[in-house]
Amino acid sequence: MQGCEPPAQIHSQTYTGIPPETQPQNQTGTETHRKNHSLPARYARRLGLLAFDIETTGLNPATHVVTAACVFGEGAEETFLFKGESEADDARSRERFLALLDAAPRLCAFNGIRFDIPFLHTAWGVPAERVEGWVLKTFDVYEACKLGLNATFSLNRLLSANGLESKSGSGLHAITLAHSRQWDALGAYCMQDTRLTYLATLQDSIALPVLSHASKRQIVIDRTTRTLFRVW
């Protein structure tokens, strides 16, 4: 779910939206750089990468609740529904989902840094040190563009810019599905968001629905070089 600004600051370290180990650096030719690029770039990025997304009944984690959560990656695809019918079932699903976030070597999300992770921190009482670990290993195109370009956009606009399929609904639609207890449809919607975020993240060059002020040309996140943003 793409939401508003987080209700609280949950990490103190400077973050760009790109995990430190994958951020462009000034120096080149290091041993780490050579190891990371011994495999085709997209295949190497796929290893250990897990996309995640949540759906909620609203934007305020103090008064609203998580209704669905999904993860998607290489060999991983799970949907968790929080129906409020059994506290024991919800607790098991909650711990399973959080454990997957803990275990993943790398995470990706769309607006997960500003919405999903802070929401989980507050709504579920997840300790700050635990969520900080997720933040520091999350690739978040939305966050990178917010901090680096002072630009924001919807997931659908990002998907369109990269020639990927569009989402089937919106966050408001997900709220309606939860209120009407259409759990299968809600789970499918959340999984679609998660899968599309994963596919967008794997692009060698992630085209952004943002134009350069100087040249009015499209800006991309270049995953094949050590340049984060460049004009296409």
Label every model-predicted segment.
Residues 61, 113, 148, 186-193:
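Aromatic-acidic/polar surface patches that form glycan- and anion
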Residues 33-102, 106:
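Conserved RNase H-like, two-metal-ion catalytic cores of nucleic-acid enzymes
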Residues 6-11, 23-25, 55, 66, ...:
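RecB-family 4Fe-4S metal-dependent nuclease core
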Residues 79-154:
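Conserved DEDDh/DEDDy metal-dependent 3′-5′ exonuclease domain
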